[in-house]
């Protein structure tokens, strides 16, 4: 059996002066091209895992491996070449005077030749639908557009893994939808592993697999459908469920028995149509 592309094995991490571990005996894997969502309330350990995966922090115990490289002081730059991060606030990520300058910044730091750089910048901006804004000032973009440019900056570096660390939390619904659609298309085209750190439960529905964190440990793991079938268990640890799940619960309480938990409005409408046709 092929080894997972991203692996954490029995990882522990405690912040300085903290009494409890922020991450306690956590083992996680992700395959090439898989989308894994880590969800949990504040203090659950999910953002610490994001920092561990990119080598911003080193585990006290356990192993972290990206591709062929085990995270260590020796391999830190090899790890960071493979892992790109998109952070919460897009304004904190901009350094260039124009959109294309900003996307080129990371390539310049990596010593990429100019001709190659121009091609990569153009390709990355095309991929996120922002090529027509190449000469615009980043400050004049909407929140969703800024995050798409931030994603382009990561894509230009051609990473194997992209970590979204609460990347949509400061966006309005339209901006959030823009970014999620961009990530979905990017993953399909580039076969990139996506690890999204989020508390937005609707965002979780995009993932192939969900890992629920609680108090630094893995609480549960499964497909979005499997996780949200345990709605009461999610609420017990301070999390809610997506709107589509709440709607199904209300329908069931009102006497509409759906066949199974569904994750889209279209699938729910199909079930309601069948129920109506049978009556």
Swiss-Prot record:
Subunit note: Forms a stable energy-coupling factor (ECF) transporter complex composed of 2 membrane-embedded substrate-binding proteins (S component), 2 ATP-binding proteins (A component) and 2 transmembrane proteins (T component).
SMART domains, sorted: AAA
Family recorded in the similarity comment: Belongs to the ABC transporter superfamily. Energy-coupling factor EcfA family.
Protein name, as recorded: Energy-coupling factor transporter ATP-binding protein EcfA1
Residues binding ATP, per UniProt: 40-47
Membrane topology according to the record: Peripheral membrane protein
A GO molecular function held by the record: ATP hydrolysis activity
Entry's localization field: Cell membrane
Keywords: ATP-binding, Cell membrane, Membrane, Nucleotide-binding, Translocase, Transport
């Amino acid at each position: 059996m092929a080894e997972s592309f991203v692996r954490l094995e029995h990882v522990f991490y405690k912040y300085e002066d903290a009494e409890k571990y922020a991450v306690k005996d956590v083992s996680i894997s992700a395959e090439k091209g898989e989308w894994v969502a880590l969800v949990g309330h504040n203090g659950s350990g999910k953002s610490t895992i994001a920092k561990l995966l990119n080598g911003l922090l080193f585990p006290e115990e356990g192993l972290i491996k990206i591709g062929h490289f085990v995270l260590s002081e020796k391999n830190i730059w090899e790890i960071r070449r493979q892992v790109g991060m998109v952070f919460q606030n897009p304004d904190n990520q901009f350094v260039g005077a124009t959109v294309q300058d900003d996307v080129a910044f990371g390539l310049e730091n990596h010593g990429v030749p100019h001709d190659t750089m121009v091609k990569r910048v153009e390709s990355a901006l095309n991929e996120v639908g922002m090529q027509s804004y190449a000469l615009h000032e980043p400050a004049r973009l909407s929140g969703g557009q800024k995050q798409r440019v931030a994603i382009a900056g990561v894509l230009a570096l051609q990473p194997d893994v992209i970590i979204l660390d609460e990347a949509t939390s400061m966006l309005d619904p339209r901006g959030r939808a823009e970014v999620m659609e961009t990530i979905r298309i990017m993953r399909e085209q580039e076969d990139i592993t996506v690890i999204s750190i989020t508390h937005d439960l609707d965002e979780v529905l995009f993932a192939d697999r969900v890992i629920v964190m609680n108090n630094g440990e893995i609480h549960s793991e499964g497909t979005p459908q499997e996780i949200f079938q345990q709605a009461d268990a999610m609420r017990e640890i301070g999390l809610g469920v997506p709107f589509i799940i709440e709607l199904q619960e209300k329908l069931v309480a009102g006497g509409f028995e759906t066949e199974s938990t569904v994750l889209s409005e279209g699938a729910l409408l199909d079930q309601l149509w069948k129920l109506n046709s049978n009556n």
